[in-house]
A protein has these predicted regions:
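Active-site pocket scaffolds in enzymes
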Residues: 1-85, 89, 93
Length: 93
């Protein structure tokens, strides 16, 4: 598995890493919601591991065809972490 993506909240130190055996990931944001409570605009994100869109029509992409007696085996792990950030800055006059 490999780390396909991660999200970090630098204020709280919360972090989620998404590890997967899949070749691709779609990222969706809550940009389409109308802003009514409890679904505020931009307050959501989805990380969806998957194969590449339109894979059957692109022979250069990993195959999504499953033949008889083959086993489909993919894995996704959401790892939740706490990270500590140390910020320093130099004031420029």
């Amino acid at each position: 598995m490999r780390v396909a993506g991660s999200l970090v909240d630098v204020d709280s130190g919360r972090k989620v890493e998404v590890l997967t055996t899949m070749p691709g990931m779609q990222v969706y944001m809550a940009n389409w919601v109308d802003g009514e409570f409890p679904h505020l605009q931009h307050n959501g994100v989805a990380l969806e591991c998957q194969h590449y869109p339109d894979s059957p029509n692109h022979p250069e992409f990993p195959t999504t065809v499953l033949y008889p007696n083959q086993t489909y085996d993919e894995r996704i792990v959401f790892r939740f972490l706490y990270v500590c950030f140390v910020f320093s800055y130099k004031q420029v006059n």
